[in-house]
C-alpha cells in the first residue's frame, strides 16, 4: 500500500501513528503465517497421532529461531540499513550496488521475478486458510467447494477495488492488524498454559536435535514447512520507505512476540493432544473454543485481505520500479490516491487476479498450496543476500564480518532452498514457471535496450544548427508548430539520435520557432526531480536532461511547463506571443511532441541472437502501453513516427534497365 515517502527527520523516528501504519502495511504476510504454517508441519509428520514431545518442541524451536535468524537478524538488523534514500526492496538495493558489477543485474532480475510470482500465490493461500476455519462451524461449512467459492468472491472484490486506491480503507488496516496481533498474543499465551514445557522450545538445542532425529519423518525437508513462518520477511524490507526504519524497529518486537506466542500456544495444544486422531487438523483453529471459531474466521479473513492488499500494492510498486530500470515493458499506470506512491497498474492487477484465482481452483485446499509456497521466496531471499553482500563491501564493512554474515545467511537460506526443492513436483513448478516467464521478459527487455543503444547512430547537432536556423525562417514551409519536442533515449552533450534529425530535416521538414530535445534519465535515488538545460549557444535549440528518481512519474509535459517558465523568466528563451488565446497575455506558444520509434529492418549484418531479441521485444510491445501514456502525453498534441533501426545497413537493391524492347505479354499488367 503506497504512502508518502518519509523525510530524513521522520525516517528514523517512531510514532504511535507510524506504529499502527507499520502493522497495517508491513506485517500482513508474516502475521498471517500462523494460520497455516503449523498445519503444514503437522501434516508433514503424518498427522497428530504421529507427534512426539521432542518433535513438537523441536518444530516450535525451529520456528522461533527461523524468525530470529532470517527476519530479525538479516532483515531488521542488517537489510534495513541498506536503504536507498530511505527506500528498501530488491530493486532499491540493486540500484545501490549495480555499478560494482555488471552481472548483479542477474540476481536483481531473478529476485524480482520470484517475488512477483510469490505475490500471486500469497493471497490465495492466506485467504483460503482463513476461510477453511469454517470447517469448525457445522451450520456454515458444507464442503471444500464452499471455501473455494467464498475465497474467489473475496479475491474478486479485492482486485476489483484496486482501481479506486486503498486510501479509503487503508486507515483501518493498522487498527485491525493491532487487534489481530493482540489476539495472536493473548490466545497463544492462554493456550501455552496447557503445557508450559513448550517454553523449552526457546532453547535452540531442540531445533538442531529435530533435524537429525529419527522421529522426524520428513528429515531435513521439514525446513520446507518451517520456512512458511518467515515468507513475509522480504515484504518487511520492501516497505521500508512506506513506514520508516524507526517504526519497524519499534513494531517488530511486538509483532514477533505475538507470533511466537501463537506458535507456542499451538505447540502446547499439540503436546496436550498428541496421539489423538483428528483429520484435516489445523492447530490454529483447533485451539479455539467452538463458540469463538466464527469470530476468529472473520478476523483472520480481514487479516488475510490486508496481507493480500499489501502484496498487491507491493507488486504494483515492484513493476513500476522495474519499468523505470528498463527491466520490464511499459504498462499503463494510474495514480488513484492523492499521496505519492499510490498506484494502480491494470495489466498487473488483471494478471494477478487470474493467476491467484487459478491457484485457488487448481490447488483447491490450503494444504496443497502450502506445498508450492516457499520455493520462490527462498530464491528471492538468496538473491537479496547476494546484493546485500556487495552493499556491505561497498560500505567498507570489515571483511571478516562480511564473510561471517554472508556465509551464515547463504548456509541458512541455502538449506531452506534445498529443503523446498522437494516441493517442485508438488506444485511449486507452477510458481517457478511463472517466475521464469517474468525473467525471460526482463532479459529480453534489458538486452534489447542495450542492443538498440549499440545500433542507434548519433550526429553532432552543432553541424546542423545552421540548417535548423534556416528552416525556422523559411516561410515556404508552413509552421509545423511553435515548439517541437522530441523525446530521445540517447543524448550525450552535443550528440543526438540520427533518427531525430532525420525526422526534422529529411522525412518532412518541420519548421518551428524552437526545437526541444528531451532525455529522461532515471537516477539511483528514488525521488529525484531535477533538470539541466543547454541552449547550444542559440535561442531556438533547447537540450533538456530530466533527472527523475526510479519511483517518480515520468510525466514530461508537467515538468516542461516549469522549465519553459524558468527559461523565459531568466531571459534565455524568447517569449512566444500568442495572438489568439483564452489566456490574456499568454507568453508561451503551442507544443507538439514527436515520438520516434525505431523499427527493426531485416538487417543482414545483425547477428541472429540480436535479431531474435529485438523481434521478441516487438511482439511483447504489442500488448504493452505506448510511450504516449507513459510520458504523460495523452492530453498533448503527439505525432508518432517510425524510422528503421539500422539505418547504416539499408542498401540499394541492384536493378538494371533492360534496353531491348519488352513484349507486353511477358508480364501481367497491374492496376
Swiss-Prot record:
Major localization class: membrane
Recorded GO MF terms: potassium ion transmembrane transporter activity; symporter activity
Reaction(s) the record says it catalyses: K(+)(in) + H(+)(in) = K(+)(out) + H(+)(out)
Membrane topology, as annotated: Multi-pass membrane protein
Record key words, sorted: Cell membrane, Ion transport, Membrane, Potassium, Potassium transport, Symport, Transmembrane, Transmembrane helix, Transport
Taxonomy, superkingdom: Bacteria
Membrane spanning residue stretches: 18-38, 60-80, 103-123, 149-169, 173-193, 218-238, 252-272, 292-312, 343-363, 373-393, 402-422, 424-444
Function: Transport of potassium into the cell. Likely operates as a K(+):H(+) symporter.
Family under the similarity heading: Belongs to the HAK/KUP transporter (TC 2.A.72) family.
Name of the protein in its database record: Probable potassium transport system protein Kup 2
Organism: Lactococcus lactis subsp. cremoris (strain MG1363)
